[in-house]
């Protein structure tokens, strides 16, 4: 008798298998990015000025999808470039993939970019997430209830977020490609920075969240993100013990989210003491 593809996974070994698959898939995407060469970028614009896509975005997403589909053919995959693909008999599990978070950085050879892969269970709860940053030589990962981890130069380190109350606290944020939205964000930056010593804008939401998890940033907050931008990084920050706010966006399975819904929603991560710094 064959296994029911819609049956829920067991919490223990099956969760470990999900994380391992996420790691393998993210590594496949990152391997594509590691082959970066200027001649092969093939850059085009997706609409908003500065919202770029390259041949590497597309190839990395294909690599990630191939790994996931080979192992779990009944899972749904939502990717930044390829949208949502439903299998004939969906298991209820859904993967969220950003093959190249930080495309502008990648084009300009700025090292803050990577492949982000996360998976949610049939209830929509994120279970495992990985951000693989090949130019940094870092892989951040987490599974629900098992902490957040960094692998770098063969060493594995558990992450516990930033130290509370330290001096010189740094806020990370980002800005929209849309000039009108960006002007609003810039106008509110002064009040958002109240109490922080400095601000950073790295250009990769996934890595900003991971840098809160590893204690580099004290806080990160940005509105207007897509699910694939925050899915893995938010889980990693959460499992590192950080306070995290994810947008409550309409699922891609229900045709969402709308631009208005997305642009009004904040994604945040910080120590609990800094949670009140961000708009509701």
Residue spans of the language-model regions?
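Oxyanion/phosphate-interacting regions
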Residues: 1-24, 183, 187-194, 207-280
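Conserved beta-strand termini and adjacent loop/short-helix elements that scaffold enzyme active sites
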Residues: 46, 80, 202-204, 247
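Acidic beta-strand-loop-alpha-helix segment within the catalytic core
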Residues: 118-209, 252, 257-280
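Residue-level signal for inorganic ion chemistry
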Residues: 29-33, 57, 68, 103, ...
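Short, Asp-centered acidic motifs that coordinate Mg2+ and/or phosphate
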Residues: 76, 128, 170, 218-219
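Short secondary-structure junctions
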Residues: 40-44, 196-200, 243-245
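N-terminal subdomain of lithium-sensitive/metallo-dependent phosphomonoesterases centered on the IMPase/IPPase/PAP
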Residues: 1-100
